Amino acid sequence: EITEKSNLTLQTPESFMARFNIDVRIFSEAIAIDTKNKTVTVRDLKTGEEYTEEYDSLVLSPGASPIRPRIDGIDSDKVFTLRNIPDTMKIKQYIEKSRPRSAVVVGGGYIGVEMAENLANAGLDVTIVELSDHLIAPLDFDMAADVHRYIKSKGIKLALGNGVVALKDSDNGLTVELNRGIIDTDMVLLSVG
């Protein structure tokens, strides 16, 4: 269990400099690249100031964004993705403020299963919806059966071989429409890749 937010950070700009002599600029956005002159224009997101950096070699590594399927209701403020620490804090704040009683986790990979277990440990009634016939895709079905037993022992329900068709938002929560059935819930966590 993680008790301090700082325990989630593996590296800091200072530790990158100390260990690897790499100058990491957080809260900075590359807004232009001049390949002819080998420069990058950078905007400091805190001050708005722009400056130019020269480079010998340039590696583009913009990161990834969570997948948000194109389904009705996906933009509800009760629908969350988990990709980084700010996402984690947003989910935590929602739970503390709104006191949801139930959650649907869409996606049964490592992150989805871990999130489902944490939500269940926090007292929520949790269902995992997974398109495949088993959790944790790299596992074969027989190995995944042990994971299924463990998850069910935690009180987590499984909707395997099922997918989300639409989300309907209301003052009382969300209705998750599946290929087969519906689930009423207070929040949805997307963990589909």
Segments (PLM) and residue ranges:
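Glycine-rich, phosphate-binding/catalytic loops in enzymes
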Residues: E1, D75-V79, A122, A145
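Short, conserved glycine- and acidic-residue-centered signature motifs
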Residues: T81-N84, G112, D140, A144
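A Rossmann-like FAD-binding core segment of flavoenzymes
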Residues: R25-K46, E53, N121-G193
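FAD-binding core/adjacent interface of flavoenzyme oxidoreductases
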Residues: T9-A103, T175-V192
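Residues within well-ordered alpha-helices
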Residues: T12-P13, M115, V147
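Alpha-helical scaffold elements within enzyme catalytic domains, especially in hydrolases
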Residues: S15-F16, N118, Y150
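Rossmann-like NAD(P)H-binding beta-loop-alpha module
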Residues: K90-L139
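Glycine-rich phosphate-binding loop and adjoining beta1-alpha1-beta2 segment
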Residues: E1-L10
